[in-house]
Amino acid sequence: MAEEQPQVELFVKAGSDGAKIGNCPFSQRLFMVLWLKGVTFNVTTVDTKRRTETVQKLCPGGQLPFLLYGTEVHTDTNKIEEFLEAVLCPPRYPKLAALNPESNTAGLDIFAKFSAYIKNSNPALNDNLEKGLLKALKVLDNYLTSPLPDEVDETSAEDEGISQRKFLDGNELTLADCNLLPKLHIVQVVCKKYRGFSIPDVFRGVHRYLRNAYAREEFASTCPDDEEIELAYEQVAKALK
């Protein structure tokens, strides 16, 4: 007889109305992990302006997101992810860790470069900061278009060409994607709204990656509304003057 699954509840930041999902890439990351694991779980949005007594008791520190697994409370996104990968494991649940270590660091610089770009108000610095973001996107594009070791036929003398894989580590979503995709989504929404900047078409690998990601429910259905992201960056994104 299969062991009964403990109750799993993910507490995430609420949006501007105090109910729908708010802008938080860490919350979306864990939401995606739980969905990909195929586990039964609930998601509770927490209004950061009006925390309920229950939430205060469960997590006095109030750091979101946090996870309730049975009667255990888990905090810190990285530690929660490690915990879920350890307890929700094969054969009952899929392993989500990337096979190639490089997949975990692909695109790692993008969010920092984006933050510097969007927070800048000095027009004289804008071009260089935009170039920094483009350079980080180019590194990701190179990774996505370069074949992974398991795509390379070592017996063939022919050039393997461009990788056609769907995601960072192959044709299935992994923990690496759960980390990167929510941040890439924010970059797209915020840059378009506050800088009129879109990821250039020349980065075909990045565009292919995003198309494949938006076609997956686990990503598309866990994204906050664009308006929530724009609102979160309303005071952060500095006008050039």
Curated annotation (Swiss-Prot):
- What's the domain of life for this entry? Eukaryota
Q: List where in the cell it is found.
A: Nucleus; Nucleus membrane; Cytoplasm; Cell membrane
Any transmembrane segments, and where? 26-46
SUPFAM superfamilies reported for this sequence: GST C-terminal domain-like, Thioredoxin-like
Q: Name one GO cellular component term.
A: endoplasmic reticulum
Alphabetical GO biological process terms: chloride transport
Q: How does it sit in the membrane?
A: Single-pass membrane protein
Motif G-site: chain residues: 24-27
Q: What is its EC number?
A: 1.8.-.-, 1.8.5.1
Indicate yes or no for the key word Glycoprotein.
Answer: no
Predominant cellular place of this UniProt entry's protein: nucleus
Report the residues modified as Phosphoserine. S121, S156
Task: Tell me the residues on which N-acetylalanine occurs.
Answer: A2
Question: Which reactions is this enzyme annotated as catalysing?
Answer: L-dehydroascorbate + 2 glutathione = glutathione disulfide + L-ascorbate; chloride(in) = chloride(out); iodide(out) = iodide(in); thiocyanate(in) = thiocyanate(out)
Q: Which Gene3D superfamilies match?
A: 1.20.1050.10, Glutaredoxin
* Protein name according to UniProt: Chloride intracellular channel protein 1
Q: Which organism is it from?
A: Bos taurus
**What is the gene called?**
CLIC1
